Regions:
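Juxtamembrane intracellular "pre-TM" segments in multi-pass secondary transporters
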Residues: 1-10, 189-221, 406-409
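Helix-loop boundary and gating motifs at the non-cytosolic
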Residues: 1-55, 214-260
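Structural signal for membrane-spanning alpha-helices in multi-pass inner-membrane proteins
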Residues: 32, 88-95, 156, 160, ...
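C-terminal transmembrane bundle of multi-pass solute transporters/carriers
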Residues: 58-61, 70, 74-76, 80, ...
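Transmembrane alpha-helix termini and helix-breaking/packing motifs in multi-pass membrane transporters
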Residues: 32-38, 92-93, 151-171, 244-245, ...
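Helix-loop junctions at membrane interfaces in 12-TM secondary transporters
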Residues: 93-106, 299-311
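Substrate-agnostic recognition of the 12-TM MFS/MFS-like secondary transporter fold
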Residues: 11-29, 52-66, 72-87, 102-161, ...
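Helix-loop junctions on the cytosolic side of multi-pass membrane transporters
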Residues: 123, 127, 165, 169-198, ...
Length: 410
C-alpha cells in the first residue's frame, strides 16, 4: 500500500476524485432541497431530478466508453471538469434571471460528462498502477466513496442550509477547477502504439465483440445485469421498509443509508487488506450470497436493529463485489479497450436497474413488500450461476492483447 501512495498518477486521480465527490454531494443535496422548496415537495419534480441523473448514464455510456478509448484520457478528464465549471456558471446566470428549471439541465450535463471521465480514469490506472497493486487501488477508491456516502449528505446539507443555493454553486466551481488543476499534473499521455481507428459505430461493436468473446467478461456482464434488476426493485422501496415494516417515520431511512455506507467503508478496508490474498471468484460468490440473504431478512424484519445490521452487511458485500469486479475489469481488459468494455457493461447494469425501478411500485401494489424483496433475493441467487462458471487464470490476463488484435483483424 505504501508503494501505491508513492504513485504520483494514482494520488492525483484520488485527489481529483475527492474534490469531485465533495462537489457531487454538495450539488445533489442543494438541488434536491431547492427543488423541494420550489415545488412544495412535488414527487414528480424530485423523480425528474433522479431521471436526469441516471438516464444519461444509461444512454451516453455506450458512446462515452468508445470515445474515451480514442481520446487522450488526461485531456478528457481535465476537459470534463472545465465543462462542469462552464455548465454551473451558465446555471448561476439562468437562476439570476429566475429560470430555476435550469437546475434539471445542470444535473443532465454533470451526468453526461461523467460518462467520459470514468473510463478515462480506468485507463490511467491501467497504464500507471502495477498489476499487483490494482486490487488495493480499487479498494482505496471504494473506501473513499463509502466515506462520502456517510458524510457527503451531511456536508451537502450543511453547505446549503448555512450558505444557501448560490454559495453552494460557487463552491462547485472552485472544487471542479481544483480538480482540473490536480489532473493537469498527471504524466503526459503518449499512446504506446498507434491503433488504426474505425468509425465510432464499429468501435462500439468491437466493445461488444470483446465482451462476447471473453468468457469471464461475458459472465460478469450477465451477473451485473441481474444484480441491476434486483437493486432496481429494492432501492425505491427502502422508504416503505421504514414505514410499513419498521413502523418509523420516513426520515429514518437515512439511518439505513448510514449503516450501508459504514458497511461499504469497512468492506473497502477489508478488501484492501485481503483482495490480493483471496481468490476473487470466492469473494464474489460469498459477497453475493450474503447480499441475497440480506434482501430476504430486510423484507421480513420488523426490527430496526436487525434491518440496520443486514444493511451494514449489504454494504460490506457490495464493497467486496465492486472491488473484485473493478479489479478484474482492469486486469482482464487491454488498455485500448477499457473504455469500450465499460461502455458495454455499465449501460446493461443501469438499464436493468431502471427497469427494476419502473416495476418496483407496481409489483408492490400487486403483491407485497415482502414478496418484492424475496424476488430480489432470488435474482441475486440466480446471478451467482454465471460467477461459478468463471475461470480466472493467469493466461487470461497475459493473453488479453492477443484477443484484442484478433478481434481488430476481423
Amino acid at each position: 500500500m505504501n508503494a501505491l501512495f508513492k504513485n504520483r498518477a494514482f494520488m492525483l486521480v484520488m485527489a481529483s476524485d475527492i474534490l469531485q465527490q465533495f462537489a457531487i454531494w454538495i450539488r445533489n443535496m442543494a438541488l434536491l432541497y431547492f427543488i423541494m422548496e420550489r415545488t412544495n415537495n412535488d414527487p414528480v419534480s424530485v423523480s425528474l431530478l433522479s431521471v436526469m441523473e441516471y438516464a444519461p448514464i444509461f444512454i451516453f455510456s455506450f458512446i462515452g466508453g468508445a470515445l474515451a478509448d480514442r481520446w487522450n484520457p488526461k485531456r478528457t478528464m481535465v476537459a470534463g471538469d472545465i465543462l462542469s465549471v462552464m455548465s454551473i456558471i451558465g446555471i448561476v446566470l439562468l437562476l439570476k434571471l429566475d429560470y430555476w428549471q435550469a437546475i434539471f439541465f445542470a444535473t443532465l450535463i454533470s451526468a453526461v460528462v461523467g460518462q467520459f471521465s470514468q473510463p478515462s480514469s480506468s485507463r490511467i490506472f491501467k497504464r500507471y498502477v502495477k498489476e499487483e497493486q490494482v486490487a488495493n487501488a480499487i479498494a482505496f477508491n471504494q473506501t473513499l466513496q463509502s466515506l462520502f456516502m456517510i458524510f457527503g449528505p451531511v456536508v451537502g446539507s450543511l453547505v446549503y442550509t448555512q450558505l444557501g443555493l448560490f454559495t453552494s454553486l460557487y463552491s462547485l466551481i472552485i472544487l471542479f477547477l481544483l480538480s482540473a488543476i490536480a489532473l493537469s499534473f498527471l504524466p503526459k499521455w503518449v499512446e504506446q502504439e498507434q491503433v488504426a481507428r474505425d468509425s465510432l459505430k464499429n468501435d462500439i461493436k468491437e466493445g461488444w465483440k470483446y465482451v462476447l468473446h471473453t468468457k469471464n467478461l461475458r459472465m460478469i456482464t450477465i451477473t451485473f445485469t441481474i444484480i441491476g434488476l434486483a437493486v432496481g426493485l429494492t432501492t425505491p422501496l427502502e422508504v416503505f421498509l421504514v414505514i410499513e415494516r419498521l413502523g418509523m417515520e420516513k426520515e429514518a431511512v437515512q439511518y439505513l443509508a448510514a449503516a450501508d455506507g459504514i458497511g461499504m467503508l469497512i468492506g473497502g478496508i477489508v478488501a484492501a487488506i485481503f483482495a490480493s490474498k483471496v481468490n476473487p471468484k470466492k469473494m464474489f460468490v460469498f459477497g453475493m450470497g450474503i447480499l441475497a440473504m440480506s434482501f430476504l431478512v430486510e423484507g421480513l424484519s420488523t426490527s430496526f436493529w436487525i434491518t440496520s445490521f443486514m444493511r451494514f452487511g449489504t454494504g460490506i458485500c457490495l464493497a467486496c463485489v465492486n472491488i473484485v469486479v473493478g479489479t478484474l475489469m482492469i486486469q482482464l481488459v487491454s488498455e485500448n479497450m477499457v473504455g469500450r468494455v465499460n461502455g458495454t457493461i455499465l449501460p446493461l447494469f443501469m438499464g436493468a436497474m431502471l427497469i427494476g425501478t419502473a416495476l418496483a411500485g407496481g409489483l408492490k401494489e400487486m403483491t407485497s413488500l415482502v414478496i418484492v424483496f424475496c424476488i430480489a433475493m432470488a435474482l441475486i441467487l440466480l446471478a451467482i450461476g454465471p460467477v461459478l462458471r468463471m475461470q480466472i487464470k493467469k493466461e487470461d490476463v497475459t493473453n488479453k492483447e492477443e484477443l484484442t488484435n484478433s478481434l481488430a483483424s476481423k
